[in-house]
Curated annotation (Swiss-Prot):
Homotrimer. Its cofactor is a divalent metal cation. A divalent metal cation binds at residues 8, 10, 42. Binds 1 divalent metal cation per subunit. This is 2-C-methyl-D-erythritol 2,4-cyclodiphosphate synthase. Pathway: Isoprenoid biosynthesis; isopentenyl diphosphate biosynthesis via DXP pathway; isopentenyl diphosphate from 1-deoxy-D-xylulose 5-phosphate: step 4/6. Pfam families: YgbB (PF02542). The keyword Metal-binding applies. The record marks 34, 133 as: Transition state stabilizer. Belongs to the IspF family. Its EC number is 4.6.1.12. Keywords: Isoprene biosynthesis, Lyase, Metal-binding.
């Protein structure tokens, strides 16, 4: 069994869609980034890649590459999962915390779990998604951005 940790943060920007866990959340600000800036999925991808001993998402999906401009992070997660499968890895469980003052994401967690479950072939019961605030401290507390942390556990089947 291997364990990986991931972190991501993005600034909020007016006029951008807010996408977390592959779910569009209606709000006046979204996350600014080269892709759709889904911090939840970005943290998860880095946790999975780290557990497998691979490079981070910046290596696989450089933000200077125009083909990743506004790309769906769910599609990037599909690519990460394919890379893991090539090396005979399977995912045991994932646990993700989103640090956000607003909006409240609780109503969207079931859909986020469904999106992740579908892509990484993991039962929803093995996917933890939680949210917390930063108690008005720091860039998240001031409403300037959103951050996420993730832990992933994976196993590797031995080749015969």
């Amino acid at each position: 069994m291997y364990i990986g940790f991931g972190y991501d943060a993005h600034r909020l920007k007016k006029g951008r869609e807010l996408i977390l866990g592959g779910v569009k959340i209606l709000t006046s600000e979204g996350l600014d980034g080269h892709s759709d800036a889904d911090v939840l999925i970005h943290a998860l991808m880095d946790a999975l890649l780290g557990a497998a001993g691979l490079n981070d998402i910046g290596h696989f999906f450089p933000d200077m590459d125009p083909k990743y401009k506004n790309v769906s992070s769910i599609s990037l997660l599909e690519s990460v999962y394919k890379e893991l499968k090539k090396q005979n890895f399977s995912v045991n469980n994932v646990d993700i915390t989103v640090i956000v003052e607003a909006p409240k994401i609780c109503p969207f967690i079931a859909d986020m779990k469904e999106n992740i479950s579908r892509v990484i072939e993991l039962k929803r019961e093995r996917i933890g998604i939680k949210a917390t605030t930063n108690e008005k401290m720091g860039f998240v507390g001031r409403g300037e951005g959103i951050a996420a942390v993730a832990v992933a556990s994976i196993s590797q089947e031995k080749k015969r």
